[in-house]
Every structure is written in structure tokens, then in C-alpha cells.
UniProtKB/Swiss-Prot annotation:
Source organism of the structure: Homo sapiens
Subunit structure: Identified in the spliceosome C complex.
Top-tier EC class: isomerase
Gene Ontology CC entries for this record: catalytic step 2 spliceosome; nuclear body; nucleoplasm
Listed name of the protein: Peptidylprolyl isomerase domain and WD repeat-containing protein 1
GO molecular function, one term: peptidyl-prolyl cis-trans isomerase activity
Single biological process term from Gene Ontology: mRNA splicing, via spliceosome
């Protein structure tokens, strides 16, 4: 076989490989037409086979709204879950306001007004006025914080200079007033103030520094009694609302009381301001954002509505009705069932006595957040992202009503802080920090409460008590207490003699005098003799004090029930604690229990009035007896023989 040349070998290899490669030929026009027809037939068949709605192209998921710098804004709001401090009036506090001049003003049901000054940390008392002889109906502070006024059912208006905390004028109105509001802006010639007649829709405009003669009367603007009058200082316009759900815009003396020209509507039908009338509700609180562009309202139907001021269009609606809270509790438990039931009872009482009208709403300094009180506590709502970002005071035993918000630094230093001062490393200047504070009133309480960024101190010293007793008891209260209480009605120790041994206890008559008095008098009278420990839960507590032995009986020495006496130094933080059994807030009778473990979840729900000092093993033995698993009642009775009060 002849040898092949290199080129011949390469050609032969190429020829052998060529058949294996596919031919790259183009489809003819006829073949292309056939292929398209087949493809169309397949598509038609697929369409015929498809039953139901056609699949749509997947839509892009909506991007969640985010408020830029939200964390910074929230840092300038109170964040503590419990109130730091509380102060007293003689009677139930109904109103509270905070001024731009760093004053906090509180008013109580008996016509008294108190001025407090915001300092770097906390507040200090300034002055006390007996402003009205009767009930205070409404209070108002001017937009720049210089003037304050109050109206009461003594048919009078009192005007105060805030900075100098002095009463400067008194107007005799000649009618029962309902609402009041300063309607002047800085620079106006007249310090005009508006007051409404309680039983009609009339609005009277006065010179706050002048006499009793009104400058102007709106007698046809509203046909029903007014519920709110509020000034928007940015747009120099006033918004008023009445019980028929109507909302009106108007101006003060500089614009001759006419309709404002700086809004983008002429007819109310172009707005959403008929929303309240459509829902058969009316605003009980109105406030404006710092830039004046948003109006926040709370309605009598417990819905929070936020409008745009210029257009009158509805922006947000938050449902805070009782039915919504009930559904929320059923979906995801917010509170223990017993506590939820107690708070619902308070809400129904609020509606019964028409106290819902005292609940207000406020904006923060940025206008991005609204704050208002609910049965769960103080809600902080981000109106831009539509989310509840914080709830304050959820574990407190108070129903928050009116709020006043202080933000920033109290203006104690006369010289302004310069850029150089801020950049310096001066430790004195660095200590000057903002102290955001919410000051709030509570339903049927003669105290106002302060929520800050600081949690309350939980020390055992009486000096660190967060509830400040800044009011002395009246002569009548002292007389009643002296007559009712003999010198030996209370004691600081007692021995409970049981069928299983003696339990020595220490009592706290100073911290909870009424509870200890009830226990001591019952004990001396032999009331507890023969009572069984009718409820025993191993690893929890032993309960007694019911003459019926069912857990449903017993009463106090005064007959019926008496109020709770919570004290910050007396907690369920250790075993062998004596505490009152109850069926809810302020329902103490004669039943009490002794814990065998720490039970902190009972704090501010049951009154601690004593501790076991000797005989802990007796308590343990009683807690270990066999009981009916359904009723927690022991199979063999363990009873109190008698109680010796020393």
C-alpha cells in the first residue's frame, strides 16, 4: 500500500467527517408557511382547551411605603412603656395643654387651673388659680404660647398671661359657654378669642384683652351646638364643627370673618367634609399638623380621620371602635381576658357619661405622626406609612384621655446654642438633651401622668415613688378619717392561726391604710374565724377570706367593695406575699391570698398589703394539699382558726 501524502490524508479525513455534520440549509418559503400554519393551529387548540379566565402577566409587588428618617423622628418622641411621674389636683383632671413657651397647664373638674414649667428633666410647679366657681368646659392656648384662656359654667372667661403666669382679664359672657379658642396670629392688632354658646350654634368673637362686648357674632354659621373650634395659624383660618357633623372654614378680624381665600375649594361638595354627617357622627377633637396641611380628627364614632386642609379631601381613616378591638382580641390576644373585659367596661362607661368628648388627638413636631389615647394605651401612628409604630402605657391601669406633647429642649439657657458650641467638647453643653414628654389625663383620676424616654425607677425607697403627693387632704377628709379611724384600728403585724399551723405576717398600714384597716378590723371582729382555704393552686397561691367558701362571697368592713391601693414599693416580686383577691379594678372585699412564688403579672391588679415573716413551711404545706382539679378546692378542708392582730 502506497504511502499517502500529508495533504491527501487531511482531505480524506475531511471527507469522512463531512457527512456527520448537519447541512446548514435555509427553509423554503413554502416550508415556512406550513410551519407558521401548524403553529397557529396549535395555539388555537391550546386556546380552545383553556377553560376559565386567562392567566394575566404577574404584576410587580407594590413597594411598601417607607418614611425617610423615621427612626430619627421616633427618637424625638417618648418611648417608655410606663409613666415616669404623676402629679395631683384636688379633683378629676379634665384638660391639659402644652405651650410653645414651655409651660404645661392643667385644669380640673372643680374649676382649678395649675401652671407647670418644663425644665431640662421633668417639670416644676409654678402657680395655682381658682379659675372658675364651677366646671371648666374648655381651655385654649394661643399659637405662640403667650395667652391662655378658660371658660366655665359660671358664664365667665378668664384670660392669663402664660409667661408671667398671671390673670390679666375676666370676661362676663352672659351665657353658658361650650368651646373656646384663640383665633389671632402673631402680628395681629387684636388678640381675638372665640367662644361658643353651649346650647346653640352661635360663636362670639371677643378681644381677649378688651371688654365684654363681642366684636362679631356668627349666628347662622352653625345650627347645632359646637364641638370644636381650632385655629390653623399657618393658613390663618379657623375650622369649627358641630354636633350635626358639619365642618366650616372661616377667618378672624384681619380678613373680616370671611371664607378663607387660600384653600382649593369653593363648594363643600368638592370635598370630603360631609364625611361626618354621612356617618351620623361629629368631630370630638380637631388638630392641625405644624405645616398646616393636615387636619386630624377623632369622631364620636371612634374613628380617626385625617384630611388635607387645602383640598378638604380625606387622607386616612383609622377605626378605633370597640367592635374593632373585640375582633382584634379574638384574632390575636392583646390583653388577658379578664383585663380586656375590665377595660371594655371602662369604655362603655366612657360612652355612658359622654366622656368620649374629652379624648383628643395631637400631631408631633414633624407632622408625620399622630398620637391619641385608646383602651390599649397611647397609640403613635405614622400617617405616611399607615402603621402603628408604638403603644405607650399598655400595661398601666389608666385610661388615657387628653394628651399634650412637649418636644425639644426646655428654654432655660438665655443664649442660643451656636454651631461652635455644638461642635465643642464641652461636657456641660453635651448634657443638654431633648426631653420629649407626653402629659396626659386619665378617666376619673385626679392625677396627670408623664411619659418620657425614661422608665420609672423601681427602687424600694419611698422618695423615688413616681406618684407624687403634692396635694394635702382637705379638712373634711381629715375630719372624716379621724372620726372613722380610732388609733388602734390598724396594726403592722398579725398571726394567722390555721388548722395546719401558724403564719406570722408583716402588714403595711402606711402604704395601703384602707386595705390593712379592713383586714385588721375583720380579724379583731372574728370575721375570718372558720373560713376555709377555698382555692389552692400548687406552685401559685392559697386563697381564703370568703365566708361562703365558694369564692363569690365576702364584703369589706364598710359594706360592699373598696378601691385598690397600689404602691410602687410593694410588688409581687417574691413568694409569701399577702394580696387582695378581686373581680376587677376597685372590687376589694374580704378575700385575700398568699403567693408561694413570685407573681409579677399581678402587679397593679391586686393590692399587696403584707408579707409572711415566719411560717413559710405552713404556707407550703397548705399549697401542696390534694385539690379538685376542676374547682381548685381541697378535698379535706384547711381552715383559719382565728387571726391575732398585735
Amino acid at each position: 500500500m502506497a504511502a499517502e501524502s500529508g495533504s491527501d490524508f487531511q482531505q480524506r479525513r475531511r471527507r469522512r467527517r463531512d457527512p456527520e455534520e448537519p447541512e446548514k440549509t435555509e427553509l423554503s418559503e413554502r416550508e415556512l408557511a406550513v410551519a407558521v400554519a401548524v403553529s397557529q393551529e396549535n395555539d388555537e387548540e391550546n386556546e380552545e382547551r383553556w377553560v376559565g379566565p386567562l392567566p394575566v402577566e404577574a404584576t410587580l409587588a407594590k413597594k411598601r411605603k417607607v418614611l425617610e428618617f423615621e427612626r430619627v423622628y421616633l427618637d424625638n418622641l417618648p418611648s417608655a412603656s410606663m409613666y415616669e411621674r404623676s402629679y395631683m389636683h384636688r379633683d378629676v383632671i379634665t384638660h391639659v395643654v402644652c405651650t410653645k413657651t414651655d409651660f404645661i397647664i392643667t385644669a380640673s373638674h372643680d374649676g382649678h387651673v395649675k401652671f407647670w414649667k418644663k425644665i431640662e428633666e421633668g417639670i416644676e410647679f409654678v402657680k395655682h388659680f381658682r379659675s372658675h366657681l364651677g366646671v371648666i368646659e374648655s381651655i385654649a392656648v394661643s399659637s405662640e404660647g403667650a395667652l391662655f384662656c378658660s371658660v366655665g359654667d359660671d358664664k365667665a372667661m378668664k384670660v392669663f398671661d402664660v409667661v408671667n403666669f398671671d390673670m390679666i382679664n375676666m370676661l362676663k359672657l352672659g351665657y353658658f359657654p361650650g368651646q373656646c379658642e384663640w383665633i389671632y396670629c402673631p402680628g395681629d392688632a387684636i388678640s381675638s378669642v372665640a367662644a361658643s354658646e353651649k346650647s346653640t350654634g352661635k360663636i362670639f368673637i371677643y378681644d381677649g384683652r378688651g371688654d365684654n362686648q363681642p366684636l362679631h357674632i356668627f349666628d347662622k354659621l352653625h345650627t347645632s351646638p359646637l364641638t370644636q373650634i381650632r385655629l390653623n395659624p399657618v393658613y390663618k383660618a379657623v375650622v369649627s364643627s358641630d354636633k350635626s357633623g358639619m365642618i366650616e372654614y372661616w377667618t378672624g378680624p384681619p380678613h373680616e370673618y370671611k371664607f378663607p381665600k387660600n384653600v382649593n375649594w369653593e363648594y363643600k361638595t368638592d370635598t370630603d367634609l360631609y364625611e361626618f354627617a354621612k356617618c351620623k357622627a361629629y368631630p370630638t377633637s380637631v388638630c392641625f399638623s405644624p405645616d398646616g396641611k393636615k387636619i386630624a380628627t377623632i369622631g364620636s364614632d371612634r374613628k380617626v380621620r385625617i384630611f388635607r386642609f387645602v383640598t378638604g379631601k380625606l387622607m386616612r381613616v383609622f377605626d378605633e371602635s370597640l367592635s374593632m378591638f373585640t375582633e382584634l382580641q379574638q384574632m390575636r390576644q392583646q390583653l388577658p381576658d379578664m383585663e380586656f373585659g375590665r377595660r371594655m367596661a371602662v369604655e362603655r362607661e366612657l360612652e355612658k357619661v359622654d366622656a368620649v368628648r374629652l379624648i383628643n388627638i395631637v400631631f408631633d413636631e414633624t407632622g408625620h405622626f399622630v398620637l391619641y389615647g385608646t383602651m390599649l394605651g397611647i397609640k403613635v401612628i405614622n400617617v405616611e406609612t399607615n402603621r402603628c409604630v408604638r403603644i405607650l402605657g399598655k400595661q398601666e391601669n389608666i385610661r388615657v384621655m387628653q394628651l399634650a406633647l412637649f418636644q425639644g429642649i426646655a428654654k432655660k439657657h438665655r443664649a442660643a446654642t451656636t454651631i461652635e458650641m455644638k461642635a465643642s467638647e464641652n461636657p456641660v453643653l453635651q448634657n443638654i438633651q431633648a426631653d420629649p414628654t407626653i402629659v396626659c389625663t386619665s378617666f376619673k383620676k385626679n392625677r396627670f401622668y408623664m411619659f418620657t424616654k425614661r422608665e420609672p425607677e423601681d427602687t424600694k425607697s419611698a422618695d423615688s415613688d413616681r406618684d407624687v403627693f403634692n396635694e394635702k387632704p382637705s379638712k373634711e377628709e381629715v375630719m372624716a378619717a379621724t372620726q372613722a379611724e380610732g388609733p388602734k384600728r390598724v396594726s403592722d403585724s398579725a398571726i394567722i392561726h390555721t388548722s395546719m399551723g401558724d403564719i406570722h405576717t408583716k402588714l403595711f398600714p402606711v402604704e395601703c391604710p384602707k386595705t390593712v384597716e379592713n383586714f385588721c378590723v375583720h380579724s379583731r371582729n372574728g370575721y375570718y374565724n372558720g373560713h376555709t382555704f377555698h382555692r389552692i393552686i400548687k406552685g401559685f397561691m392559697i386563697q381564703t377570706g370568703d365566708p361562703t367558701g365558694t369564692g363569690m362571697g365576702g364584703e369589706s368592713i364598710w359594706g360592699g367593695e373598696f378601691e385598690d391601693e397600689f404602691h410602687s414599693t410593694l410588688r409581687h416580686d417574691r413568694p409569701y406575699t399577702l394580696s387582695m383577691a378581686n373581680a376587677g379594678s376597685n372590687t376589694n372585699g374580704s378575700q385575700f391570698f398568699i403567693t408561694v412564688v413570685p407573681t409579677p403579672w399581678l402587679d397593679n391588679k391586686h393590692t399587696v398589703f403584707g408579707r409572711v415573716t415566719k411560717g413559710m413551711e405552713v404556707v407550703q404545706r397548705i399549697s401542696n394539699v390534694k385539690v379538685n382539679p376542676k374547682t381548685d378546692k381541697p378535698y379535706e378542708d384547711v381552715s383559719i382558726i382565728n387571726i391575732t392582730v398585735k
